[in-house]
């Protein structure tokens, strides 16, 4: 039996029904089962990739990225994730869009989301603004979907805001779990995560 099949069986034991069509704003909003599921799916994708098996679940579609701050690792990770799943990344550059001419968040959010399955937003420059902007963007999409403007509502992945950086936290934690050979081996250890450094 392949590792992916074992991981899929493990997923069946988890309570994760609320994850579907649910945005990922903050790490601490997820249940233990949901965090476990994210790590399990990441390991399954890694296993498939290492065995040169396709991981595409989309035949078409867009992953929209909006970076309101500089990024290297997260930017390329999001683009790679879109590609891995079969989505084409489309970068929303605010300086080259109608946002620069005063277009509202509501108009922009709905316009760029017509064919989008996921939207990744990084807005971490100012305390009190990043998460608020992400919520405003997604509230506009919820309204657009409810009013029939959008055929589907894309899911948000927080690529860092002023409150949390869930993708970095999750990637770092999974690395630590692999390094120690399982989450159970972290019991009794002190882990400090500071910026991009982990100390154990």
Model-found features: residue ranges?
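Positively charged, low-complexity intrinsically disordered leader regions
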Residues: 2-76
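Conserved helix-loop functional segments at active or binding sites
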Residues: 44-48, 143, 178
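Conserved hydrophobic helix-helix packing surfaces used for dimerization/oligomerization
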Residues: 63, 191-192
